[in-house]
Amino acid sequence: MARYSVYRLKSGAMVLDCQADLLAGLPTRFSAPLLKSSDVPNPIARLHPSLKIVGERRIMVTNEAGAILVSEIAEEIASFADDDMAIANAFDMLLTGY
């Protein structure tokens, strides 16, 4: 598991892993759901970064982030390690308002 990797869950949903790699031994991962743009009617740019995954635009729904069981992860499909600032800024917005 790697921070800022996108995983497809067994349910078919996509999530962005946001947990520090140092905590890889835990049975859960802190992640944010990645929804289709059409499912997020009024995204807030800084809170909801837009990511292109396998040719499709997805919105990181930061305000719905939470823990998922590692056993629910089916496959890794992308990495956004190069977009770490936009992702970290989304959590800053959620937690501090800035």
Task: Give a label for each model feature.
Residues R3-G12, L16-L47:
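Compact nucleic-acid interaction/catalytic patches
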